Amino acid sequence: MSTRKLNRQQRWRIDKIQEERIARLARREARAHSLLEEGGLAGERPGLVLAHYGTQVHVESLPDDPQGPCLQRCHRRANLPALATGDRVLWQPAALEDGIGVVSALLPRRSLLERPDGHGHSKPIAANIDQLLIVIAPQPTTRDLSIDRYLVAAHAADLQPLLVLNKRDLAEAADLARLDRYRHLGYDCLSLSARSGELDELRQILPGRVSAFVGLSGVGKSSLVNALLPDIQQVTRELSSHSGLGQHTTTTARLFHLPGGGDLIDSPGIREFGLGLLTGEQILAGFPEIASWRGRCRFRNCHHEHEPGCAFVAAVAAGELSQERFASLRSLLADGDAATDD
């Protein structure tokens, strides 16, 4: 198949976009240097990224910082990779309280949840998290394939997944049966209701950990956050006053400190969590009950479709593997599309 040639106008547009991107990076770096030379920045200190707003991030000082508490918007130096909520960084606060600081270095991450952007590049969602809370609800319905995407992403990032059925008061038998199917596969599952306040089981697993909510818009992630954090409106107003954005913005992940210890990251809704950054082996590993059959096929290059002697197909036919899970695996292995935001 021949490569489509770009016409002159298309090449001009691509070059112009690239020039504008380079110019923006140069202006950002020049601004950081200007602040430093003018004495507009304080000394370097470690910090935590609470939220990400376009080209700026919201950073707070760590609890044990000898220089005391500080919370500011910051630019990111042009030589740094994209930052994520939950990142630990080195930063220089602005000397003025309402100024803009600069993030000068990214500290090593112990984990990173990421997905492809519209161009197939890495888009960090949250960093340094311990467990991924996959929130589903009777309405809107989350497909099994979407749940499996999150489970694969959690496995690839070495995160502990937990399936959370919210709006339990609206759940039907089919919703509870699906939860039981995943519980039978070995996944931890909870059913609860933010509306009725039945959150004791959830509260027990949050202290001492960094957790992240993921799931479709409308499944009640924000309602769960509001129930867990009675003072959430006050915290949100403080963040909004610094960012200049509204209180109900759902386009960015935000980190909140829990009263009982631990942190919680609330992420925006995602229709489909893309796995285009993962290899086929990584996707297969995210289905542990199926991956255990690897190496039993007659042919080493088996595609697990219609080849004779395929151990996977035989196990499904014998009822030893879930037909639905095997269909999800085949779909994900064939899917190279990037994720799309709600």
Predicted regions and their residues:
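Solvent-exposed alpha-helical segments within well-ordered globular domains of core cellular machineries
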Residues: D87, L145-V152, L176-D180, H184, ...
